[in-house]
């Protein structure tokens, strides 16, 4: 099956390939749902919700860095994130502040965060893979493994991929689970 889309998780891969493949599939779908939009498209809401595609991009960029950099690798949040902003601006800062960001800035924030996360996968693999301890621990000091942290991020994407489906359809009618893929007959 060489004609599979590049975002399709492997059908016969090991646990790490399946888990990171599932994460990449969610990433690809969210990025496609948010692609090629101007400020109005990224700022559009539906119903009574304040949620926007731009807000989702920024939120997921934060989540990528917080998961891989802080929770797993134990390094500080990279630029441009400043964790004190949530203390002063509230828990929804990334969602609300996205309205002031240009589309190229939002796409760049997300793309850069995903690139950092993908680079972190090599370090994770080198230090023991999914079963290795993440940098964070439970309040009682018990270790948390990398597997759980990555599963949490897959869950976060799953939740917001559904939101992105609804928001994008409201913007311009784009529907579908996966980006178009050229398949040769």
How would you label these PLM feature ranges?
Residues 2-9, 16, 20-91, 133-185:
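Short, contiguous alpha-helical
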Residues 90-132, 147-157:
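Acidic/histidine-rich alpha-helical segments that form the ligand environment
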């Amino acid at each position: 099956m060489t004609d599979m889309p590049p975002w399709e998780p492997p059908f016969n891969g090991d646990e790490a390939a399946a888990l990171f493949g599932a994460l990449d599939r969610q990433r690809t779908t969210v990025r496609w749902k948010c692609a090629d939009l101007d400020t109005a498209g990224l700022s559009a809401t539906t119903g009574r919700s304040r949620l926007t595609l731009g807000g989702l991009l920024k939120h997921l960029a934060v989540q990528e860095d917080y998961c891989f950099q802080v929770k797993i690798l134990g390094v500080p949040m990279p630029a441009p994130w400043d964790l004190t902003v949530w203390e002063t601006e509230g828990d929804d800062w990334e969602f609300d502040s996205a309205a002031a960001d240009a589309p190229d800035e939002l796409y760049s924030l997300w793309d850069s965060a995903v690139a950092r996360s993908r680079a972190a996968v090599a370090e994770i693999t080198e230090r023991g893979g999914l079963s290795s301890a993440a940098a964070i621990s439970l309040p009682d000091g018990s270790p948390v493994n990398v597997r759980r942290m990555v599963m949490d991020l897959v869950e976060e994407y799953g939740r917001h991929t559904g939101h992105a489906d609804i928001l994008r359809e409201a913007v311009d009618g784009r529907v579908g689970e996966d980006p178009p893929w050229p398949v040769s007959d």
